């Protein structure tokens, strides 16, 4: 007797990535059971930065305004020498982003997790189970069976698909025997989170202090918090640097005694790792289970959330029966180049910051200060395109992030709904598109395109004639073309 399915997708791990994936799947009508070994949300700050693209994803889940209210928009990111000279200043405030949201947002991770779980609590399709550990996995042609253990004993759960969102030490990845490829960047740092009592005594910008005696990061966190990260030096042990008097010594030059109180201290090894395979049959990996990055570019959490957005609509298309499961192979081919670019940027920044040789540091300072003096500013990072996969190869704009124009307080995504969308020059004066017609016409014109098909994760499938786009989309997803006339979302 074949066992009935308990749900469509088992999500293992309910950090931000698992919670976002479950919420996105529920929106697509896919049932999930999310398993989390901890009974409570991890109460202390971890990730502190997300970008405009993640705010746009949160907008889809109805959380953008509530997260914006408790986040702080980063004004600038400065690299300074040991004596305080500005080596590079990257202005972030007032930067227009393709999504219309602030380019750089500093936040408190437990707050985000609470808000995401609130979305799940309101969805009949999402079943959250806390205090549950996965002890064994088995898969066959039809589904995955997980043996799980909790205070109520052991049981088995059966699902069509399983996604491991269970972090850097992923049980799911280990159970599948998937190896990691390592960038060979491995630096231990002390991370300190503080509650702020007097904000007037703290820096207003995010700082990298390129001090060869001890490279240091000092950044905003969510409302009422600040973070310092100190590189550990050869010979130092975690016990030594975690001692309160040692930490007070590190903070002394910042002159914040009385202005902050310690909330959390932890030693982390910053490294760059990518799982060699993100899919094994009916089991997939997302977030830190699939890749880990040093924090210097603020892209760790962002990368995991992009995974969730890429995977959710594809799983939904396969589960609804229209798409061939091979569509899921495009998940890694599209996301891995994006992830590797983010990791390589973070490591390059880390190598600039982590110089401890005084002579090499002096040369770096001189070179960076000369560029700063000459007015040479780093270009804003271009939104990363997805790699080859579910896109109309060779068409202009394929794989780019499609922008979200705003018209007064109306936003394109909110008007058009979850997608996919087919937007053509011919329908720009429709009531739904008219407020955004100028921006959309400009986008199409820049790519000499008659029409564009935008996927549910807001990446461009391709440009061309509406017929060619419909045919191409159907070949990939099995679903009929999206309606030409976008329907306003209710």
Describe the function of each predicted region:
Residues 5-7, 152-161:
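Core beta-strand elements of the Rossmann-like FAD/NAD(P) dinucleotide-binding domain
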Residues 240-303, 323, 345, 382:
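FAD/FMN-dependent oxidoreductases across multiple families
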Residues 26-46:
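Glycine-rich FAD pyrophosphate-binding loop
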Residues 46, 51-119:
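Active-site-adjacent segment of FAD-dependent monooxygenases/related oxidoreductases
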Residues 118, 161, 165-270:
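Conserved FAD-binding catalytic core of PHBH/FMO-like flavoproteins
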Residues 18-19:
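N-terminal Rossmann-fold NAD(P) dinucleotide-binding loop
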Residues 130-144:
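A conserved short coil-to-beta-strand element within the FAD-binding core of flavoproteins
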Residues 1-8, 12, 27-28, 37, ...:
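Helical substrate-recognition/capping region of FAD-dependent monooxygenase/halogenase enzymes
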